[in-house]
Amino acid sequence: YATVPGFNNNFVAGANYFVVQDPSVTAGLRQAKLGELILLTIPQDSLKYAGWGSIKPIPKNYVLDLNEIANIQSATMTFNNYIEQQAIAHNLAYVDMNSFLKTIQKGIVFNGVTYSPTFVTGGAFSLDGVHLTPRGYALAANEMIRTINAHYKSTIPMIDVNKYNGIL
């Protein structure tokens, strides 16, 4: 890439960030930045065999840049705040699933089994990296049950998460 006009070569010996398309820079490509995300929908064969990310930049539609991530986070916060306000206004139980999913990042133990966001082996998220596994949905259901029980002073029993299928 040293011969590509406008490309700032920041490569070092060892691991480097992927090379991604970026129409906003002169060269039209750059190294990915810390905090940017490569989508799991990227064709794996293109990474392995077509040189995407190393000798060819990863197409923009497979990359979430820092601005896009900030926009997503802002929209998520706006939607969640609206939902919470409506629940409060109508005296309904409100489950903050965004906060709950953030607790999974730290790991949740249920009856001796730890669930985390670790891809494939964490047990909470499916192989698409977005949706929960049946066990992950059972964890979410338990969070809903806890909230309903607290708000309405009910006694709905918790689900045994470990009885549901996981990935492994």
Predicted region positions:
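Acidic, Ser/Thr/Gly/Pro-rich low-complexity segments that form flexible
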Residues: 1-89, 100-120
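Short, exposed beta-strand "edge-strand" segments with a Pro/Gly-rich flavor and a Y/T-containing core
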Residues: 62, 89-95, 125-132
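Sec-exported extracytoplasmic/periplasmic mature domains
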Residues: 81-91, 95, 106, 142-153
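Active-site proximal loops enriched in glycine and acidic residues that flank catalytic Cys/His/Asp
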Residues: 96-99, 136
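Histidine-centered active-site loop/cap adjacent to the catalytic His
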Residues: 118-167
